[in-house]
């Protein structure tokens, strides 16, 4: 399947469908070089305010990331949205982008990045450090997963 990479209203470059894509279709594999999390961390500091948190890193598991700046394809330009039309499927350290619903020709492909971060961050921190520009109706304001809230303890008789 050929995809079109062009300017996006969300941020920078985006990937657009050049034809209709049916729900459930595997659209593209996210390719690049497998690197350790330590190597990925050395490439970017979480709290560097001068950086727009723009990387081509995709965490595959607890050990490795795919660095799409090295041997990556069009998938590295797929933007985030809090209302995605695509989802990620990880199989044996390979990452595939699948259509969550039918996608029309010319529509931008987007998935929820759902960044995992330090649990000490508040939503205000996440919105400041990882701001979202998707403008979806239900936008949570950040590319990151919301912090987990402790469950209230239930008193049992």
Segment roles from a protein language model:
Residues 1-89, 152-153:
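Catalytic cores of histone-lysine modification enzymes
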Residues 81-157:
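C-terminal SET catalytic tail plus cysteine-rich post-SET Zn-binding segment of SAM-dependent SET-domain
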């Amino acid at each position: 399947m050929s995809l079109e990479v062009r300017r996006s209203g969300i941020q920078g470059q985006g990937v657009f469908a050049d034809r209709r894509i049916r729900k459930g279709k595997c659209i593209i594999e996210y390719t690049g070089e497998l690197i350790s999390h330590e190597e990925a961390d050395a490439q970017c500091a979480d709290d560097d305010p001068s950086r727009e948190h723009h990387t081509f890193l995709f965490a595959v598991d607890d050990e490795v990331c795919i660095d799409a700046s090295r041997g990556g394809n069009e998938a590295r330009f797929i933007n985030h949205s809090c209302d995605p039309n695509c989802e990620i499927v990880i199989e044996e350290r390979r990452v595939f982008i699948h259509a969550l619903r039918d996608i029309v020709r010319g529509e931008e492909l987007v998935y929820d990045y759902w960044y995992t971060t330090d649990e000490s961050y508040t939503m205000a921190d996440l919105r400041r450090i990882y701001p979202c520009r998707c403008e979806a109706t239900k936008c949570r304001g950040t590319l990151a997963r919301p912090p987990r809230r402790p469950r209230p303890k239930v008193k049992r008789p």
